[in-house]
Regions:
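Hydrophobic face of amphipathic alpha-helices that form TPR/SEL1-like repeat modules
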Residues: 15, 46-58, 88-98, 132-141, ...
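Alpha-helical segment of the N-proximal tetratricopeptide repeat
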Residues: 7-27, 226
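Terminal, low-structured helical/coil segments at or just beyond the last alpha-helical repeat
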Residues: 392-416
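Short helix-capping/linker turns of helical repeat alpha-solenoids
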Residues: 38-41, 54, 59-60, 80-83, ...
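TPR/TPR-like (Sel1-like) alpha-helical repeat modules
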Residues: 71-78, 356, 379-396
Length: 416
C-alpha cells in the first residue's frame, strides 16, 4: 500500500461509496479492475468488496456477486502490499497464516498503522476499516494480545472496553465522510452494546437514519421514510421516498405508487401510481408489491384500461414467483369467471381456500363450486348452501340459492 491512495482508488471510492448518485459505479468498477491488474493492491481490495453484495456496497450499483473472485482479490491485495487489504482480509476471515506470510509488513500492527494514518488524513473508507478493527475485536490479533497478556480479568476487561469504544468516533467520521454502512455498526453498538463490556445506549441510535437521509444516502432515506410511514407521517415519508428514488434506489417507486394509490399524504392519483409501479419493475423486476399493485389496477380498470390478462399475469407472478398471497381473491375471480385465463374451478377453489377473511363474493364462489360439484370436487349441496347463505346480501348468492330447497326431512336438494 502506498503512503497515499492512488488517484484511481480515490476516484472509485468517490463514485462507489462517497457519492453514489454520480451514476458512475460501473465506470469505477472498471477503473478498479484496470488498476488491480496493474498492481494496485488497494484497488484489488476495494474491488473485492464490490463483489461481496449489498452488505458491503450499495445495491443500486448492481455489481455482480462473486465470493470466490472476491477472496482471490483479497489475497492478491495482500500480496500486492496493500495494508488496507490486510485489514479487510483479516476482517473477512481470509488472512490465513499462509496469506499473512505473503504480506510485506513486519507485523499486523505495521499494516494497521498505515491505514490509520490515511484515516487520520480524512479518508472515510479507511476510517470505516479502522472502526471495524475495534468494533469486531480484530485489534486483539493486530496487537497480539489476549487475556493472558493481563494480570487479571478485570484489567483485561478494562483494556477491551477502552479499545472497543474507539470504534464509535471512527464510525462517526466514516459515516459523515461518505460510508453509509458505518451507521449500521453504530446502530448495533448503541442498541446492543457489546457483551457486558459496553452498555447499550439506544437513545443515541434514534436519529441515525434521519442523519443518513439528510446526508443524502439513498438507503437511509428509504429506511427513514419507512419509519415515517409507520408513524403515519405520510407527507414527510413521501418526500424521502422521492429523494431515495432519484438515486435511483430500489423499492422506492413501489412505496410512492402505494401512497398515490391510497391517498397517503397526497391526493389519490391512480394513473400516477400505476406509472410508479411500472418504474419500480423496470428497476427491480421481481418487486412483489408492484406486481400486486399492477394486478389490482388492471383487474379493476383503475388508473389504466381494464385488462384481465395483464391482471392475471402480474398477480400470478407475485403468487407463484414471490410467494405472495395478497392477490388470491382476484386470482380466484379470474379462474372462477374465466377472466384473463381459461375458466378453472379447481384452481379457483385453491385460491379461495387462501382467502381467510370475510368476503361475500368468495363465499358465493365457494358455494357454487360445492353445490354444483365443480372443479373436481364431489357435489355437496348442504355445504354449498351454507356458503351461499354466508354470502348474505350478495346478489348472485341470493339468486343461486333459489335453485335449492329443503325437503320435508330437512335435506337440501336442487330444485327440478
Amino acid at each position: 500500500m502506498a503512503a497515499v491512495l492512488s488517484s484511481e482508488v480515490k476516484q472509485a471510492l468517490q463514485d462507489i461509496y462517497y457519492n453514489v448518485r454520480t451514476g458512475r459505479g460501473r465506470e469505477a468498477f472498471a477503473l478498479l479492475e484496470k488498476a488491480s491488474a496493474a498492481g494496485d493492491g488497494d484497488a484489488s481490495c476495494v474491488l473485492a468488496r464490490c463483489l461481496c453484495g449489498y452488505q458491503y456496497v450499495w445495491g443500486g450499483h448492481d455489481f455482480p456477486e462473486d465470493d470466490a473472485r472476491a477472496t482471490k482479490l483479497l489475497h492478491k491485495s495482500v500480496e500486492q502490499g496493500s495494508a488496507l487489504g490486510v485489514l479487510v482480509a483479516l476482517r473477512s476471515g481470509e488472512l490465513t497464516p499462509s496469506v499473512q506470510k505473503k504480506m510485506p509488513f513486519g507485523s499486523l500492527q505495521e499494516a494497521f498503522d498505515q491505514v490509520e494514518a490515511l484515516a487520520k488524513e480524512g479518508d472515510a473508507f479507511c476510517q470505516y476499516v479502522i472502526g471495524n478493527s475495534y468494533f469486531w475485536w480484530d485489534f486483539l490479533r493486530i496487537q497480539n494480545k489476549g487475556k493472558d497478556s493481563f494480570p487479571s480479568q478485570a484489567e483485561f476487561k478494562a483494556y477491551l472496553k477502552e479499545e472497543i469504544s474507539k470504534c464509535e468516533d471512527w464510525f462517526w467520521k466514516a459515516f459523515r465522510g461518505g460510508v453509509h454502512f458505518a451507521a449500521n455498526n453504530l446502530n448495533r453498538y448503541y442498541t446492543q452494546g457489546d457483551e457486558d463490556i459496553i452498555a447499550p445506549q439506544p437513545e443515541k441510535a434514534k436519529d441515525l437514519w434521519k442523519i443518513g437521509a439528510e446526508l443524502g444516502y439513498p438507503s437511509h432515506q428509504f429506511i427513514y421514510a419507512s419509519e415515517l410511514k409507520k408513524q403515519e407521517r405520510y407527507q414527510e415519508a413521501l418526500h424521502w421516498f422521492m429523494e431515495s428514488a432519484a438515486a435511483p434506489n430500489s423499492d422506492c417507486w413501489y412505496e410512492i405508487g402505494f401512497m398515490y394509490w391510497n391517498g397517503k399524504g397526497v391526493e389519490v392519483d391512480k394513473a400516477y401510481a400505476v406509472s410508479c409501479y411500472e418504474k419500480e419493475l423496470a428497476l427491480t423486476p421481481h418487486n412483489t408489491g408492484s406486481h400486486n399493485g399492477l394486478g389490482q389496477a388492471y383487474f379493476l380498470g383503475e388508473g389504466v384500461p381494464q385488462d384481465y390478462a395483464k391482471a392475471f399475469y402480474h398477480l400470478s407472478y407475485a403468487y407463484e414467483k414471490r410467494g405472495s398471497e395478497w392477490g388470491v381473491f382476484y386470482l380466484a375471480k379470474c379462474c372462477f369467471y374465466g377472466l384473463g385465463t381459461p375458466q378453472d374451478y379447481g384452481k379457483a377453489l385453491q385460491f379461495l381456500n387462501k382467502v381467510d377473511w370475510q368476503n361475500k363474493e368468495a363465499d358465493y364462489m365457494r358455494g357454487v363450486i360445492y353445490a354444483q360439484g365443480l372443479g373436481g370436487v364431489s357435489a355437496d349441496i348442504p355445504k354449498g348452501v351454507a356458503y351461499l347463505q354466508k354470502a348474505g346480501s350478495f346478489t348472485k348468492a341470493k339468486e343461486e340459492l333459489l335453485h335449492y330447497k329443503k325437503t320435508l326431512f330437512g335435506k337440501w336438494v336442487r330444485r327440478n
